[in-house]
Amino acid sequence: MIRLGKFRGWAILAIVFPAISFFNIPAQASPALNAPIQITSNPGEDFAPTVSADGKIMVYVSDKSGNLDLWLKNLGPGIQPPDQRLTFHSAEDGSPEISPDGKRVAFVSHRSDPRGDIYILDLMAEGGPKPVIQKPGEERDPVWSPDQTALYFSSRSSSTAQPVIEKIELEGGKRTEL
């Protein structure tokens, strides 16, 4: 004679154990999320990338020209042209930021001030970068306003001063400390 108590225990265990095992399946990592894809392959350093809002271009800093310059890389599908050097000055350029419409790049250059000034390079026009700020002091990390009429940046008037965040209107050059 089979005792119902023992049978019922095994029956419950037979149902519960597979259910627990089902919820204990190890998660598989998604290769798209965990495997970065190398998109530059220079013998020197490539860093500080900024990607356009439409994802078609990237501007980055590289020392492959002998000093730190800005370079443009096309990110579209298929075979792309070689990366294009954007700045050609012997001073270091860095901290690029592509405008929301993808037509201009704000960046910091040490060409007129060893502490850094902000310049804008029009990607659609001939000619070199135009200075936005060329004053004594340190200006860094430019960021475009959404409407592209102003830049926000950090500045320090002297090596002992505390950094502050400022805004500069591109038309007229009015600076406002925030």
Question: What annotation goes with each model-predicted range?
Answer:
Residues 2-4, 25-178:
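Sequence signature of WD/YWTD-type beta-propeller architectures
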Residues 10-22:
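Bacterial N-terminal signal peptides
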